[in-house]
Structures are given as structure tokens and as C-alpha cells.
Design a protein with these regions (language model features):
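Interfacial helix-cap and linker-helix signal at transmembrane-aqueous boundaries
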Residues: 45-57, 135-136, 166-167, 251-260
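C-terminal ends and interior cores of transmembrane alpha-helices
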Residues: 182-194
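Extracytoplasmic gate region of multi-pass secondary transporters
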Residues: 108-165
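Helix-loop-helix hairpin linking two adjacent transmembrane segments in secondary transporters
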Residues: 35, 39-86
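A late C-terminal transmembrane helix in Major Facilitator Superfamily
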Residues: 43, 224-261, 269
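Intracellular juxtamembrane helix-capping segments at the cytosolic ends
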Residues: 11-24, 212-225
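Hydrophobic core of transmembrane alpha-helices in multi-pass small-molecule transporters
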Residues: 1-11, 118, 198-211
């Protein structure tokens, strides 16, 4: 069941961001970020609905209802999507940046982006996956943790929109670095404070800081690779970020089992966050030609 859910999600999120990056040039950042905000909006709206549905009708009827709703809501929008942009038009609007201008091969740059995506999402997974359990461990109860998770996702929407606007002015890599540094600061704050009010505030800040990180990889790929390759390359990098989320959630759980505390798990997330920031700094320090006027 979860395999089919994953396959279905992969057929929408990555291709949608790749398609949006092809249609927009001047406002590409905000366009991609708006498209990427859908899953965060769902993360805010669905949990209370699902909680009520499962309490009243059980999980089977809830899953069936969600499936029917998704099918009925998604199919009409798929029909309404515009056709893919002609390759010729995309090539004319392509950036003068390329992996070769960085002094590395395209495949080497892809590996670096995948490692960066994996590292940032290992760090990102610690609060997102374990905040509910963390609140239970502190004695606040899982309900408080669920509220903090909703706050993360809610402020993540603002983060994605803001990061998109920033990317249109600064570029994908600088915006990614800003998000990575701020995410590291939020993780560090989790180490310093564990009061209930503090956790609410830090969780909101974490969502506000990290929400725009993942869409920036789509922007960076579009900036440095040929439009003909954008779909497959964005898909590969997003796969690395999702693997990082899975690895980070599992790794944090293992660390908690061995240490009996989430403190070491937060430290582990900080280390992975530094790896991400180092790669992005390297990317920014490489000499690149000026962008052609769009």
C-alpha cells in the first residue's frame, strides 16, 4: 500500500516542479515554490480531518475516502494542465551557467547536489518525524507534538513563497544557503530549550526556515543544466532529498534507542546540516559567468 502511495506521489511532485521551471524564466523561483507548497498546505489541512474521520469511521473508511477524494480532485486538474513548452523556446531562455563553467562534469555536479539534498533532509527529518514522540518523551503528550508539526508545515508555506521571491532576486544557490543556515540555527535552538512554549516557537521558526529549501534544488538544476535534462535531473535530486528524509527519521530513532535522549539526534542533524552548507558554499565560490538577460 505504501509503495503505491509513494509511486503516486512521485508522479506528481517532481514532474510538476520540473514543468513549472520550464514555463517561467523571470519569475521561476516563485512559480516553482507555489507549485511545491501544495503538499505543505495538505499537511496543514488533512491531519485534523483524518483524525476526526479515523475516530468516527475507522482507518479503512478513512483511507477509502481519501483515495476517492484524491482521484476525483486530481484527474480534472490533470486534464486542465497546459501542454509541455516547446524545447526550442526553453533553449532560447536557458541560462549561461552550466556545470562545465564550475570546472566539474555534469554528473559530478549531480552527485554533489544529491549529497547536499540528502544531508539537508536528514537534518530536516529530525523535528518533522520525531516532534510528536519528542513531546511525548518530555511529558507534554503527542497532541501537543501534532500541533507543533502543523505549525511547522503551516509556516513552511510562507517559507516556500518567501524563498521563491528571494530566488528570483538572488538565485537558487544563495537562497538555499540562507535556508540551510537558518535551519541549522533552529536545530541548535532545540538543543537549548525544551519548554512547551519554547518548542511551539522553535517549531514555527523551523518551518519558516526550512520550508523553502527543497524547491531550491529544482531552481539550481534549471540554472545549471540543459532544459532537455531538467525532468530527469530534478527527479534524481528530489529522490535524494526523500531518501534523506527517510534516512534521517530512521537514524534519529536509532540514536534515541541507543542514548535514551533526542539530544544526540539533534546534534546528528546539525552535523548533516553543515555538510549541506559546505557543498552550497563551494558551489557559490566557484567562478561562473554572468547570467544572460532574460
Amino acid at each position: 500500500m505504501h509503495l503505491f502511495i509513494g509511486v503516486g506521489a512521485s508522479a506528481t511532485f517532481g514532474p510538476l516542479m520540473a514543468d513549472m521551471s520550464q514555463w517561467f524564466v523571470r519569475h521561476r523561483g516563485i512559480a516553482v515554490s507555489i507549485a511545491a507548497s501544495g503538499n505543505y498546505i495538505g499537511g496543514v489541512l488533512w491531519p485534523p480531518v483524518l483524525q476526526h474521520a479515523m475516530a468516527t469511521g475507522g482507518w479503512r473508511h478513512t483511507y477509502l475516502g481519501v483515495g476517492m477524494f484524491c482521484a476525483l480532485a486530481t484527474l480534472p486538474f490533470i486534464v486542465a494542465l497546459r501542454r509541455a513548452r516547446p524545447i526550442a523556446g526553453m533553449l532560447e531562455a536557458a541560462s549561461t551557467r552550466s556545470a562545465h563553467n564550475l570546472g566539474v562534469s555534469p554528473n559530478a555536479l549531480m552527485v554533489l547536489l544529491c549529497v547536499a539534498g540528502l544531508a539537508c533532509c536528514v537534518a530536516m527529518a529530525m523535528p518533522q518525524v520525531h516532534i510528536v514522540a519528542y513531546c511525548g518523551d518530555l511529558g507534554y503528550g503527542p497532541a501537543r507534538g501534532a500541533e507543533m508539526l502543523s505549525a511547522m508545515l503551516g509556516f513552511g508555506i510562507l517559507s516556500r513563497i518567501g524563498s521563491g521571491l528571494m530566488a528570483d532576486r538572488l538565485g537558487g544557490a544563495p537562497t538555499l544557503l540562507i535556508g540551510s543556515v537558518l535551519q541549522g540555527i533552529a536545530l541548535f535552538l532545540y538543543l537549548l530549550f525544551d519548554g512547551l512554549v519554547s518548542l511551539y516557537i522553535i517549531s514555527a521558526l523551523f518551518g519558516l526556515f526550512q520550508g523553502g529549501i527543497v524547491p531550491m534544488y529544482a531552481i539550481i538544476v534549471r540554472e545549471y543544466f540543459s532544459p532537455k535534462e531538467v525532468g530527469i535531473r530534478i527527479g534524481i535530486v528530489l529522490m535524494a532529498t526523500l531518501f534523506g528524509m527517510a534516512l534521517g527519521g530512521w537514524m534519529s530513532g536509532i540514536i534515541f534507542d541507543y542514548t535514551g535522549s533526542y539530544r544526540a539526534a539533534f546534534l546528528n542533524g546539525l552535523i548533516w546540516n553543515v555538510v549541506n552548507a559546505v557543498i552550497v558554499v563551494w558551489l557559490l565560490l566557484r567562478p561562473t559567468p554572468r547570467l544572460a538577460a532574460a
